[in-house]
A protein has these predicted regions:
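Sequence/structural signature of outer-membrane beta-barrel proteins
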Residues: 48, 88-89
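Active-site metal-binding loops of divalent metal-dependent hydrolases
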Residues: 84-86, 120-122
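Short catalytic/ligand-binding loop motif for oxyanion handling, primarily in non-cytosolic enzymes
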Residues: 1, 19-24, 89-90, 125-128, ...
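Loop/turn elements at helix/coil->beta-strand transitions in domains of secreted/extracellular proteins
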Residues: 7-11, 75-80, 112-116, 138-141
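Metal-dependent phosphoester-hydrolase catalytic domains
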Residues: 33, 92, 96, 103-117, ...
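Structured beta-strand-rich core segments of catalytic domains in phosphoester-bond hydrolases
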Residues: 1-78
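A cross-domain feature marking catalytic cores of carbohydrate-active enzymes
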Residues: 15-16, 83-85
């Protein structure tokens, strides 16, 4: 759907299964505006380079993070984006997944100092204890803290839960959400 409807964009990422199919945590970026400098997809697990791997106690679905480093051709700035879909069933898997993403971003010796945007469906609410991981990373700020409910369109009903997040580090200015 993304590739068919966002023709001015490239969509990068791969499927989460061992065969690199199924759901993706893709990143879409405008072709004319961004230069892709680096891209990686890794599994949220103790073996991040093994396709389809999972944390113990996690749901049956493997979870991934797609990361990319871009150069904004208009602004001349470099920044990193990480997009993920954390586990829906395992509290420990969500906590470890978020920690893994933030640590992975920090451990990059080449692009480690660039501004970072971490986005995704974290499958947790802002006040859940899994979000305490953020206390270990005070250089990251949750800029979606007060935006209210996010809507994904999968089901109808009265679910008033905010489970989608945008966490930033560095000189990031958000003009709209």
């Amino acid at each position: 759907w993304l590739k068919e409807n966002l023709t001015d964009y490239y969509v990068i990422g791969c499927g989460r299964s061992a065969e690199l199919r199924d759901e993706q945590s893709a990143i879409a970026y405008r072709k004319e505006r961004m230069n892709l400098m680096k891209m990686d997809t890794y599994w949220l697990s103790e073996t991040p380079d093994v396709p389809g791997s999972r944390y113990p106690g996690q749901s049956v679905c493997p979870r991934i993070c797609t990361e990319a480093v871009f150069e904004d051709l208009e602004a001349g700035k470099v920044f990193r984006v990480a997009n993920a879909h954390l586990d829906n069933a395992g509290e420990l898997a969500r906590r470890k997944g978020l920690e893994q993403i933030l640590e992975n971003v920090k451990s990059d010796t080449f692009f480690g100092g660039v501004p970072v945007i971490v986005t995704g469906d974290f499958n947790m609410e802002p006040d859940w204890k899994e979000m305490e991981v953020m206390k270990n990373h005070p250089d990251f700020t949750n800029i979606t803290e007060n935006i209210g409910v996010t809507y994904h369109g999968y089901w109808k009903g009265n679910d008033q839960t905010c489970i989608d997040f945008m966490i930033v580090r560095g000189s990031i200015r958000c003009e709209s959400l």
